[in-house]
Amino acid sequence: MKTFVAKPETVKRDWYVVDATGKTLGRLATELASRLRGKHKAEYTPHVDTGDYIIVINADKVAVTGRKETDKVYYWHTGYVGGIKQATFKEMIARRPEAVIEIAVKGMLPKGPLGRAMFRKLKVYAGSQHEHAAQQPQVLDI
């Protein structure tokens, strides 16, 4: 019996919508990363993108435990000398709530071209509206 290897052109990808209201950030991100990789499928192949498309709504209502709301700090650099910037979790939720989930999930995906392809299948929206109704996404309860 030969080992099954998924081919990129034969992979069937589904669309799912996840409501992030009240969900813990890390626990949500691990499940999203696993599904973006396709690890929940029987035909999972490490070097082939077998994951599904995932739409996350209500990203502004995601929760963190403990004092992370004020203690967790996000850093980025503008590219200019002395251009290091920082913001707490609370400030990031107010400024760009989508980025909080995107950063958490991106860190859990492989680094390189395959990981970037997997990350492109994640669509995050701050509110409850999304623009992917034509894909008829199924509700995924995490």
Curated annotation (Swiss-Prot):
Swiss-Prot/TrEMBL keywords: Ribonucleoprotein, Ribosomal protein
Signal keyword on record: no
Keyword Ribonucleoprotein listed: yes
Gene Ontology MF annotations: mRNA binding; structural constituent of ribosome
Record Gene3D superfamilies: Ribosomal protein L13
Pfam families with a match to the protein in the record: Ribosomal_L13
GO BP term, pick one: translation
Disulfide partners: none
Domain of life of the organism encoding this protein: Bacteria
GO cellular component, one term: cytosolic large ribosomal subunit
PANTHER family according to UniProt: LARGE RIBOSOMAL SUBUNIT PROTEIN UL13M (PTHR11545:SF2), RIBOSOMAL PROTEIN L13 (PTHR11545)
Subunit structure: Part of the 50S ribosomal subunit.
Record's function text: This protein is one of the early assembly proteins of the 50S ribosomal subunit, although it is not seen to bind rRNA by itself. It is important during the early stages of 50S assembly.
UniProt similarity note: Belongs to the universal ribosomal protein uL13 family.
Name of the molecule in the record: Large ribosomal subunit protein uL13
